[in-house]
């Protein structure tokens, strides 16, 4: 049985990107073809030469909300709030960071004005009702702070409000960016279109659970967080058309892979709207995509396990070793990989 420790690798802390490069598509791109082909060190801006006319790139069009708030308990203790998802205009599922857990009926006095009341709790998440001056989503857009990942050791600034969004973000609801999409700027998209590459979109609202570590030793015992997603009929038709013309379906990010795999029914992609808790790790056969663009992921994370299921665990760990040796930049604001699938029987 696979263990969490099977997905460990050593990463020097200085390789964790603390901010974006000045140009989105200037990030490096490691090409990881199917074995035994060698890794190639490229740049994201090289993608038009690496892809083929008729290929379909599938993006996640979710938009990050400024979901971080601060306040204090009535007793005076400080509270940090991270909105996980909206439930109507004035309620939300929230993660709280505080010295002591809160109980139903407790109030939080918000620094930005108004207050929130605890209605219930489910594990690490609280259900809060917000008494604020406008609908919660609108209010957050004015007063909320962008929730940068915990491994970025600085406060967010105005530049992050632009750069921690994809240029095609339109469906509001994520608390973390689909980071593979951050590398695509308008110039690169125009060059890909000119190459004959088509674009399609899914929506998956990335939740705060994406940063939660695996806390069990055996992978089979891990329970994934739930996230809302949508695969529309238009995208399903685009995938079918790409397959019919011999084009490849290329996922931009693990959220796209999780969405497409969750929408597979009897071996066929179908339109779907709902929740997914899919956990993809080696032993699972990914059938919905032919390649994927993805960033470098944390050691022992579910995202690293997903890419290992696609490209092979040994192959991925070898690629990560190469990336460390070549001083690639890691995680959300870091560099990317273009992955192709493992060979049959490859571990």
From Swiss-Prot:
GO terms for cellular component: cytoplasm. InterPro entries: QueA, QueA_dom1, QueA_dom2, QueA_sf. Transmembrane segments: none annotated. It holds the Pfam family Queuosine_synth. It is an enzyme of class 2 (transferase). GO terms for biological process: queuosine biosynthetic process; tRNA wobble guanine modification. It is found in: Cytoplasm. Keywords: Cytoplasm, Queuosine biosynthesis, S-adenosyl-L-methionine, Transferase. GO terms for molecular function: S-adenosylmethionine:tRNA ribosyltransferase-isomerase activity. Its main location: cytoplasm. Its EC number is 2.4.99.17. It catalyses: 7-aminomethyl-7-carbaguanosine(34) in tRNA + S-adenosyl-L-methionine = epoxyqueuosine(34) in tRNA + adenine + L-methionine + 2 H(+). Gene3D superfamilies: QueA-like (3.40.1780.10). Pathway: tRNA modification; tRNA-queuosine biosynthesis. Transfers and isomerizes the ribose moiety from AdoMet to the 7-aminomethyl group of 7-deazaguanine (preQ1-tRNA) to give epoxyqueuosine (oQ-tRNA). Belongs to the QueA family. HAMAP family: QueA. Monomer. This is S-adenosylmethionine:tRNA ribosyltransferase-isomerase. It comes from Xylella fastidiosa (strain Temecula1 / ATCC 700964). The gene is queA.
């Amino acid at each position: 049985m696979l263990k969490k420790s099977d997905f460990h690798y050593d990463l020097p802390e200085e390789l964790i990107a603390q901010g974006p490069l000045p140009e989105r598509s200037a990030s490096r791109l490691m090409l990881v073809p199917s074995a035994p082909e060698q890794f190639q060190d490229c740049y994201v801006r090289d993608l038009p030469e690496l892809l083929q006319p008729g290929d379909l790139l599938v993006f996640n069009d979710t938009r990050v909300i400024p979901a971080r708030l601060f306040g204090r308990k009535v007793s005076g203790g400080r509270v940090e709030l991270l909105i996980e998802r909206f439930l109507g205009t004035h309620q939300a599922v929230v993660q709280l960071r505080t010295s002591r857990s809160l109980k139903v009926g407790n109030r939080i006095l918000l620094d930005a004005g108004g207050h929130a009341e605890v209605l219930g709790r489910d594990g690490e998440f609280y259900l809060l009702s917000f008494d604020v001056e406008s609908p919660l989503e609108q209010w957050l857009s004015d007063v909320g702070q962008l929730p940068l990942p915990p491994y970025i050791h600085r406060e967010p600034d105005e530049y992050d409000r632009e750069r921690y969004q994809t240029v095609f973000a339109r469906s509001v609801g994520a608390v973390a960016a689909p980071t593979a999409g951050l590398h695509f700027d308008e110039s690169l998209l125009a060059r890909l279109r000119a190459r004959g590459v088509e674009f399609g979109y899914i929506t998956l609202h990335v939740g705060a659970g994406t940063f939660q570590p695996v806390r069990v030793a055996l992978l089979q015992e891990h329970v994934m967080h739930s996230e809302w997603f949508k695969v529309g009929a238009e995208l399903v038709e685009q995938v079918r058309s790409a397959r019919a013309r011999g084009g490849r379906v290329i996922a931009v990010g693990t959220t796209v892979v999780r969405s497409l795999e969750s929408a597979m029914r009897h071996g066929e992609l179908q339109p779907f709207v709902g929740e997914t808790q899919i956990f993809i790790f080696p032993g699972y056969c990914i059938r919905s995509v032919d390649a994927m663009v993805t960033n470098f992921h944390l050691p022992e994370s579910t995202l690293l396990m997903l890419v290992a299921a696609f490209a092979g665990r040994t192959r991925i760990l070898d690629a990560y070793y190469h990336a460390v040796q070549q001083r690639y930049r890691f995680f959300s604001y870091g560099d990317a990989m273009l992955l192709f699938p493992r060979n049959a029987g490859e571990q």
